[in-house]
């Protein structure tokens, strides 16, 4: 890669909804812009997506690469996704080494190993596709996990709904 044409430290960018509310923000310790392909490399990026109906989701990594048109962000190395508990839904976390994000379409995907936790459930897979608009999750291969559904009284049930 050639030298960057500009560098920004403590970088922050925000995307707003039509009503003026914040849709998502991207912050990074450092951003380097490369004119040869109009991409940007981010050091310690964090993207936070704001959705009043689903709660905020944050993505962190050691590095990120923003595409030339700004439509995608590739998070690399020690990728962590977190959605705090929201509206009765338990915390959700995801860890992987690479995550491709299309913020304006609410899409994320990877072809790498992932570990996904949702409350007391844990699933591991190789590859994942997630559409946050439709809440559809596709685990691509080698899926293994333990799913625990909450009982009506709020206690976690044993896997597959067996009584304890």
For each of these PLM feature ranges, what is it?
Residues 1-164:
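Mature-chain termini and adjacent capping regions
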């Amino acid at each position: 890669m050639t030298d960057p044409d500009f560098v920004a430290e403590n970088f922050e960018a925000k995307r707003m909804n039509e009503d003026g509310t914040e849709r998502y923000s991207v912050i990074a310790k450092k951003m380097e812009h490369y004119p040869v392909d109009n991409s940007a490399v981010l050091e310690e990026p964090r993207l936070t997506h704001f959705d009043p109906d689903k709660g905020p989701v944050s993505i962190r990594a050691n590095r990120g690469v923003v595409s030339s048109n700004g439509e995608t962000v590739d998070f690399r190395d020690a990728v962590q996704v977190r959605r705090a508990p929201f509206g009765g839904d338990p915390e959700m976390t995801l860890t992987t080494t690479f995550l491709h994000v299309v913020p304006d379409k609410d899409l994320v995907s990877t072809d790498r190993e992932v570990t996904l936790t949702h409350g007391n459930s844990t699933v591991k897979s190789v590859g994942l596709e997630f559409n946050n608009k439709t809440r559809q999750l596709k685990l691509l291969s080698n899926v293994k996990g333990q799913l625990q559904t909450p009982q009506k009284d709020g206690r976690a049930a044993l896997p597959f709904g067996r009584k304890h």
